[in-house]
């Protein structure tokens, strides 16, 4: 009798835990970003980061090279210098705890203009795991690619390492190292280093970044201090750039647990030099930002502002020009969450275009956004509608919708984006089914159609982009994949770049 009671109790506890996990939202909206939690989805284990990102309406996979458009890829808010296409296709969703699609983080992250951020938080294993991979690109050009990736997790230390090498007309080398050290329950240090080297016939390009992020938690309420120090270096055949930076940020509840505050200061000093010429520029930025969020059971209210003090000095053939200005990014947002599956967002965002060297004219963008998200384990739907008012330029409207559906043997992602302006209206439509077949076979197809006035179609001459991928898993260690991308290049008479090609890859996991 006791044995039966024990079995029934165990089954009940297991079902409760499974229900609780399934009841958690897969998609979570915040004022300035959308969070996706892959661990709450039903995964086969072979889904890549690129597969998950196709759930986002604004992330139209434009082609083989232009993978994430003007999104900056980061890990734990540290920019990556790696081969973006490789990282997106190799990083598995099962190794990701959270994806932050930051489309309006002008206050929190200091992004300006239309710049946006993809911030990845890894799910570290209990031991060492990783892979080595060899790829070959075959088409008008033949390229060889080698890469290695490692994840290590323990009670006190996490480590992420990624390195890749690409050989074509020249050589491309990438290296990223990211380590987390937890000294105790209230202190941790994240250190980050990345470098990029491109050796092309036209010259050499090198990027180096280093950053340290220290977190200290003061109390059980979650009051946390962040201190960041970093350095970036860039050099090519024409210019060299040096950039030291710092951030000090405090996140804390204020008066009540429902009200939270983010307060920070950030600064950097960009030194640019033109080689073999008497030209240089120095840019000194200092930012102060403040954001409040008030949370109720079904409502979240956010308001924030970042004030940027900008000082610019340029020297050209002995002539010095100076310019100073003060600008601000702002947001105000309301989110309604009736339950764990439905969310509605209404927001206002103000941001500006940073002036380029020699051009000190501010251009402000005001965006009004309405968004809806529905998510459960096997089905997600996201819709977005935004109206942009651009200073001294054309106003426009953007509409987007995407849906993801999963069964035992098939997953289907589709969506559409619409751009409306006086100068012209265009749209794009995406469909990406993936079939999971017996004997560890996987077949995926991605098709994106563009209407006549689409900038991508005008640039490439291609009304349809398509790619076909076939993967076969051999046991637990080996994976073989073949991708046929830019499939319609060969038959489109108006195409400007004929690069129809195939990619073959072999991966060994440890």
Give the location of each predicted region.
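N-terminal periplasmic accessory domains that precede
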Residues: 49-52, 86, 111-134, 146
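Short acidic/polar hinge/loop motifs at secondary-structure boundaries
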Residues: 78-105
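Transmembrane beta-strands of outer-membrane beta-barrel pores
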Residues: 135-140, 154, 165-169, 193-199, ...
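Extracytoplasmic beta-strand/coil segments of soluble accessory domains associated
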Residues: 24-28, 50-81, 109
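Outer-membrane beta-barrel "beta-signal"
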Residues: 333, 481, 496-510
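Short strand-turn segments of transmembrane beta-barrel domains in outer membranes
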Residues: 42, 126-150, 163
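Flexible loop and strand-edge segments within Gram-negative outer membrane beta-barrel domains
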Residues: 167-247, 280-281, 352-362
């Amino acid at each position: 009798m006791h044995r039966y009671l024990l079995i029934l109790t165990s089954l009940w506890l297991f079902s409760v835990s499974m229900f609780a996990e399934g009841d958690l939202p897969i998609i979570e909206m915040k004022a300035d970003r959308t969070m996706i939690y892959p661990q709450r989805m039903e995964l086969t284990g072979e889904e890549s980061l690129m597969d998950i990102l196709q759930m986002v309406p604004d992330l139209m996979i434009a082609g083989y090279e232009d993978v994430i458009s003007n999104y900056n890829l980061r890990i734990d808010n540290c920019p990556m210098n790696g081969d973006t296409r490789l990282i997106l296709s190799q990083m598995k969703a099962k190794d990701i705890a959270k994806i932050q699609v930051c489309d309006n983080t002008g206050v929190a992250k200091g992004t300006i203009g239309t710049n946006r951020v993809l911030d990845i938080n890894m799910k570290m294993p209990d031991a060492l795991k990783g892979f080595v991979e060899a790829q070959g690109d075959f088409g008008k050009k033949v390229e060889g690619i080698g890469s290695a990736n490692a994840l290590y997790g323990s009670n006190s230390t996490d480590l992420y390492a990624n390195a890749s090498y690409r050989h074509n007309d020249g050589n491309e080398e990438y290296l990223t190292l990211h380590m987390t050290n937890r000294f105790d329950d209230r202190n941790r240090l994240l250190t980050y280093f990345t470098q990029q080297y491109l050796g092309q016939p036209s010259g050499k390009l090198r990027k180096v970044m280093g950053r340290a992020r220290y977190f200290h938690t003061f109390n059980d309420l979650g009051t946390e201090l962040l201190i960041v120090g970093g350095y970036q270096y860039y050099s090519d055949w024409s210019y060299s750039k040096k950039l030291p930076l710092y951030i000090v940020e405090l996140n804390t509840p204020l008066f009540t647990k429902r009200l939270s505050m983010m307060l920070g200061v950030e600064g950097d000093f960009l030194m640019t030099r033109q080689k073999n010429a008497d030209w240089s520029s120095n840019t000194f930025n200092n930012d102060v930002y403040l954001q409040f969020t008030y949370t109720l059971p079904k409502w979240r209210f956010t308001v924030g502002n970042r004030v940027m003090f900008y000082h610019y000095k340029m020297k050209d053939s002995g002539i010095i020009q100076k310019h100073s200005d003060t600008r601000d990014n702002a947001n105000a947002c309301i989110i309604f969450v009736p339950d764990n599956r439905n969310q509605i967002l209404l927001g206002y965002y103000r941001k500006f275009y940073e002036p380029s060297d020699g051009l000190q004219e501010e251009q402000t963008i005001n965006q009004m956004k309405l968004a809806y998200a529905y998510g459960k384990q096997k089905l997600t739907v996201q819709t977005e509608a935004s109206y942009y008012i651009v200073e001294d330029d054309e106003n426009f409207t953007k509409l987007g919708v995407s849906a993801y559906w999963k069964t035992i043997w098939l997953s289907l992602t589709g969506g559409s984006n619409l751009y409306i302006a006086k100068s012209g209206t265009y749209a794009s439509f995406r469909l990406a089914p993936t079939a999971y077949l017996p004997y560890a076979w996987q077949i995926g197809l991605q098709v994106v159609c563009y209407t006549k006035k689409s900038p991508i179609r005008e640039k490439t001459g291609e009304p349809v982009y398509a790619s076909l991928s076939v993967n076969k898993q051999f046991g637990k260690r080996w994976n073989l994949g073949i991708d046929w991308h830019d499939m319609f290049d060969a038959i489109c008479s108006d195409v400007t770049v004929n690069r129809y090609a195939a990619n073959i890859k072999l991966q060994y996991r440890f």
